[in-house]
Amino acid sequence: MKFKKVRNLNILDYCKKNNIKWAFFDCFDTLIHRTITEEDLIQKWSRRMIECLPLELRVPLIHARFDVINIFHQEANFNYNYEEIMSSVYDRLLYIQNPSFSMDKKRFIELALEKEIQINCDFCVIDRENVALLRELSALCVKIAVVSDFYIGATGIRKILGSKKELSLLDKVFVSCDYRSRKADGDL
């Protein structure tokens, strides 16, 4: 804790001395932390989706989602967005389910995104120390941007961050799927 305070003072001092205009932060594991694993998140998403869908089992839904992501990765496609994932999941569900699955694709994607955002809001907590640093940077008139490799675009990230009132200081949100780029590639 003491080290982090010293580090934050050094960051603030550096920003003052060098007239820094922008500070960039990662979203997950920096500003907010998930309290469950990604696999648990998908399980919870599946359960919430099942409540709204005419699907007899959630297993096909979970398998369809994991299969789609695995196929994207096998094809070296790491720059996908949520709509692409859910469009492919929908197509798989149509293929494997009985005719009782009759939800419109657009509505399915909207519902899936809504549930995904809700679960992320429910199972994320803020990093108080980094948010305190945001406040101090903001007080220095440093603009704050979030950069994230996430399959939900900036609108979704803003909703997740917006559920945490302390994160209202953000000036800009950059999400990899909106730009078809990744931080890991140095493109974002």
Predicted features along the sequence, with ranges:
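Asp-based, Mg2+/Mn2+-dependent phosphohydrolase catalytic module
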Residues: M1-N19, Y151, I157-L188
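Active-site neighborhood of HAD-like aspartate-dependent phosphohydrolases
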Residues: N10-R65
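Flexible loop/turn segments at secondary-structure boundaries
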Residues: L31-H33, E39, C124-I126, I152-T155, ...
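Hydrophobic (often cysteine-bearing) scaffold residues that line and stabilize catalytic clefts
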Residues: E38, I42, Y82, N130
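Short, surface-exposed alpha-helical segments at coil->helix boundaries
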Residues: Q43, E83, S87, A154-R158, ...
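A metal-dependent, Asp-based hydrolase signature
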Residues: W45-K115
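Substrate-recognition element of Asp-dependent hydrolases with the DxDx(T/V) motif
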Residues: R107-G162, V173-F174
